[in-house]
Each structure stands twice: as structure tokens, then as C-alpha cells.
């Protein structure tokens, strides 16, 4: 095959999907004569077509002009001369400013990048593609084999797609479906841009073969359309090799019938799910649905659902680009290894945002027998309440019951909020989950759940472009209850603009703040607990979330710098604000962890470069020192819990979090931790005038118990909240008797002496 033609076919096949190309400086396709790129006069597309309409794609035989008219370039008025330069000196034989013949792939990519620079047009993806697995397959010899070449070579992929050699293992293993290649597969090459893109950049069409059951000689070639939307789209193209389901909707897997648990009760409720065999159906990491499908009805034997995989938005224009650009390199077949360089995908799959899904998959594979059984077991493994309750515990896409939660417990809600915080409907009414099985605009619920996917935070995963909500102004809704006669005003907090970290702030600010308690009017101080919610680190960082006692100062000391990380005020710590500056400046950025820990929870290394930049010399951090501070932080919260228990207020880590100590033993007994026994009489501790301060102490405990990094985010704010809460709840007076209050808990056997010692070491002998 002509190498010139291969390059000619590939010229415009680099990342042409995302934005209008008006402004590239090219002549339009209608033939307006002027000066084109390269400074040579243009002649218009009509003149080009006169000669080049006879030039065909060397593999499909289709006219390159026909292909070009299907391209994004054509639809946006970017003519032939927009890429090749003016043709006035060409006339079929003369020079072109930007010819393709004889040009290297690097030269062609550079020409594309003259527009695809990320400003005029989407950034060229050529560098990512060149370094990815498609251009550098694990086994180059696979491209030379007749069957394997279908998905492991440039020519085989195009020939196979045209011949309808596409589908599950039943098709690919059937000799009757295999095409007769017009050339020896030994001559085939690895994939290029033109493998997936026609001349001009349009996506290639893929075909498959179907037949009518029981009807002889009914086999026919039809468009491959597994998402059944009658559109030649990205899902069709990518799944022609990375197959997810058949044309009839059958899930790809081992070919076995899977038994899926559908009940939270042990040993009851299963559903049979038929799978069609993938060609590579004996290794889980070669079968895409093992990580890219969530069984709708699956449950665990405790509570909540199981999320077995990512849910692809099949009917969007670029569902694969929701997470993948042109890098095509995930390295997720196992968690680590010298031959598996780290990737964002490897990080995310082990992160809390990803529900630690990959860890569940790898663990299941390690326990499974080999072959098809491995595929089956890994397909059924997933995130559960044990590892990812924030994603699995409720049916978050059920708008009627969980609409208010969708902003932070679904990617759909998160992306919609970050796109337009001011216009976001906090009831969830504006969120559409039609990509989830069974969810419609009328029933508004599905049994599938989302994790925090790439597109929740990013607009373009391939370039890493983040959504841009701007500085967050959070309106914490007032507490109102007709049943208790409670009324409350909204509390508005304006947070600073911290660039990329604004994205993190969207979900790490809490649902209520301490000032919500102060804004309540209640006649008797008997009402439900005001819940801060979980992981409110952003609010702690800026000192806004806690219940602050009157007469006490909570201002940061002058030397406090954590809220300035990732800004110009803290050179060398990045430019994307404190959240990204601390949690994403590590070799494993999308684990979102600034440290590593061993199996006991002890910190083994501080990996965030921001920590090292600031904490040097006398103030250098060590893993041992940071572990000790974390343990003392936890101990101080145990002391606060004990002090609350001394007043009959028991903490238990389940909503509504505080319960009555009916037997006065200071322990949250099973019969006490039920919703009907929730603690509500806040005025009963120190009288109606002080009910808010009593609830405030409980609020601060709940707030910081659910911020496990509170000792690092803003240790001054955290220490002051804990100190003041213990100080007040002990005797109803702010008199700095915290040491005595902690010792009293030991005397009452609500706290052991070792924990008390650690708590006092953390808080000190005077108010922090």
C-alpha cells in the first residue's frame, strides 16, 4: 500500500470533535478566492474537486471528496485550502504550501496544530495518540495475524469494519464471517489517525452482519449500531473493538449466565443475566463490561446497592471521550507494577471518588479461578456500602427522595451545579439521568448509580479542562420545621476564588454551618439535630463552618498559610488553589491523597509537594509527627464525645447522629441508636437560653468527626472548636477548664486515660 496515500488519508484526522473552527483563517468551501494559509492565492474547493474527486481511499475505495463532505471541517466552512494552503500555483502539478506527499507524521501533526492549538481550535491530540496504546500495541505481531488484525492493525480494522466483521466472539470466531483481505496481513501496520477517521476527520462507518433466526441465507450486512440510535457515532466506532453489548442489547462477557444478587437479605433474591462471549473472554481486563457496566438490580447482603462499573452515556456524541482523550492508556489491569506506569485512570479507580472500584475488581480477580470464571467474578464485584457508602447507600438518582443530594452524590448533579451554581435547582429537578437504565423524565429513578466520573469535574477529560463555577457563594438553607415550630433564616457564605479548587469546594462545604443554629427561632429548644453533613474540609479551611461561641475569637493566626496554597501568596505551591495544591501535587494525583498510609493507618510518606515546599527546616513534617497529630486529633474528639455523653447526649455514626442515653451508662447501646430515641431536648441540659450552645457543641463534634483531615486542613480552627465545645458542655460556662473536663471523663469511665492524655497533648493547657 502507498505510504503517501496513508499519510494523505491521515492528514486531518487529529481531534476534530469539539468546537467550531471559524477563525482558522482558511478559505471557505464555497470557493471564495483570496489569500490562503502559506500566502498563496486560493482557487476555491470547486477547482480542487475537479481533479481530486477521482482520488479514493486506498482501503475502502470511497472518494476522499465524499469523505471530506462528511467532516466537521466541511460543515464549518473550512475548505481544502484551509489545510493544504492556496492552490493558485498548483494546477495539478505545481507546489502547494502544505503538501502531504513526503511529509513525516510529525510534520503533518505540526500542520494540524497550527489551528489545533487549543485557542483557535481544539488542541491537537497527536502527541497523546502517538504515545498511547493504539499506536504502540503491546504485541506488534498481533497486527500481522489474520484474525487479530481486526482490532490490532490499521488495515485490518478498516477492512473488517467495512466487511461487517464486528461483534461478539460468536461472530469473530466464525470463519463464515471473516473477510478475505485484499492483501497479506503480514503487510499490515499499527493504527494511525486514519484508522478511525476518514479524509477530513469524519468518523469511519462500521458494519456488522446479522441473520434472521430460522431463515436460511438471511445473513446480511448492516450498520453496527449497538446503542440503537441510528446514528454513526463514537459509541459505535469504539465498541466495534471494545465491545460492550451486541446489536440486540445482550451484555458482553464470558458467555455464561450470571447470577446477580437482588436482595439485601442473605441468601435470597437473584436474577439471571445472560452474557454474550467476547472474543477475549478469559481475562477480565480485556472485557470492557467488567468495569464499564453497572447491573441495575444488584444489591449487597447488608444495605445499599453494588456499583459494578462505570455507566457509559451511550447516546451522547462522545461517550468515550467523557473520560478518555486520545491517550488510550489506562494501565488498570492491576494496581501497581513496573510494567504498569501510573495513570489518572489507575488512580481514580482506587480513589474514594471512584468508589475504590478498581480495588474490588483486582481483589475479585485474585480470588477467582482462571478463564471465564474470572471474568464472571470480576463483573459481579464492585463498590458497596463497606467501601463507598456515599455512592451506594441510597438510590441517588431518585429525584423524589434524593433530589437534594444529587449535587454531590452524582456526576450529573455535580456537573450541572459546577456549570451554573447560581441557576442550579437544589431539588434536583433539572438533572437528567436518561443514560441510566430505566430512568425517564416521568419516573425519574433508576437502579443504577453513578460514581464521581471524570465528566463530573472536567469538561474535556482529554485535556484535563475543568468546569469553572467561579468563586462559590453558598446559601445554607434555614432550618424550618412545622412539627417543632422551628423557623430559621438562610445563611450565606461567600468563599474566595481559588481557581481549580473551586470545583472541590462545590461539594466540600457542608449542608449546614454553625450559624444556621444561631439563625433559628424555637420556642422550647426541642428540635432535631442540625446536621453539618460529611467531608466539609473546604469550610474548615476558611473557618466558616463551625459553631462559634460568643466572646471567642476564631480568626486564623497571622502565619497561617493553608488557605493560600495554590495561589500567588504561596509561591511554589501551584496555581489551582489549596485543594488541588495539597491533594493533587503527588505522583498519584487522582487518588486525592497528600500522604500514603500502611495497613494500620499510620502515615508512611508525605507525598504532596506543597507540604514539602512550606514545611522545611525547623517546621519540617515527618510521617511519624503527622501520624501522632492525627491520633491526638481523634483522641480530642473522643474526649468531646465523652463530655457530651456525660450530659446524656450519645454520638452514634448514623443519622441523626445524637441519641438519648436512656440508661445513663455513657454508651450508645443498640436499643438506644434508633431514630425514635434521637436526642432533641437541647434546652434540657442548661436551659432554654443556652440550647443553641448545647447543640453547637454536638454540631462541632459531628462536623469534625466527619472531617478526618481536620487536623491538617486548619488545625487552629479545629482545635478552637473542640476546646470551646468541651469547655462549654462540661459545665455550661466558657471558663477554660478543659483539662479538668477531660480528666472528669476518665473518672466517670467514659474515656480511657491514654486517650485523655493524647487529647490533652493535642489541645494544650491553654486555649489554642
Curated annotation (Swiss-Prot):
Coiled-coil ranges (or none): none
Signal peptide: 1-23
Recorded GO MF terms: metal ion binding; oxidoreductase activity
Binding, heme c 8: 405, 408-409
Residues annotated to bind heme c 2: 80, 83-84
Covalent lipidation (N-palmitoyl cysteine), chain numbering: 24
Residues lipid-modified (S-diacylglycerol cysteine): 24
Binding of heme c 9, residues: 454, 457-458
Binding annotation for heme c 11: 579, 582-583
Membrane-protein topology: Lipid-anchor
Post-translational modification: Binds 12 heme c groups per subunit.
Gene3D superfamilies assigned to the protein according to its UniProt record, in alphabetical order: Flavocytochrome C3, Chain A
Binding site for heme c 3: 112, 115-116
Residues reported to bind heme c 5: 193, 196-197
PROSITE patterns reported for this sequence: MULTIHEME_CYTC (PS51008), PROKAR_LIPOPROTEIN (PS51257)
Keywords assigned by UniProt, alphabetized: Cell outer membrane, Electron transport, Heme, Iron, Lipoprotein, Membrane, Metal-binding, Palmitate, Signal, Transport
List of residues binding heme c 6: 238, 241-242
Binding site residues for heme c 7: 320, 323-324
S-S pairs: none
Residues binding heme c 12, per UniProt: 611, 614-615
Positions with a binding annotation for heme c 4: 148, 151-152
Cellular compartments annotated: Cell outer membrane
Top-rank lineage group of the source organism: Bacteria
Its job: Not involved in Fe(3+) reduction.
PANTHER family given in the database record: C-TYPE POLYHEME CYTOCHROME OMCC, DISSIMILATORY SULFITE REDUCTASE SIRA
Annotated protein name in UniProt: C-type polyheme cytochrome OmcC
Gene designation per UniProt: omcC
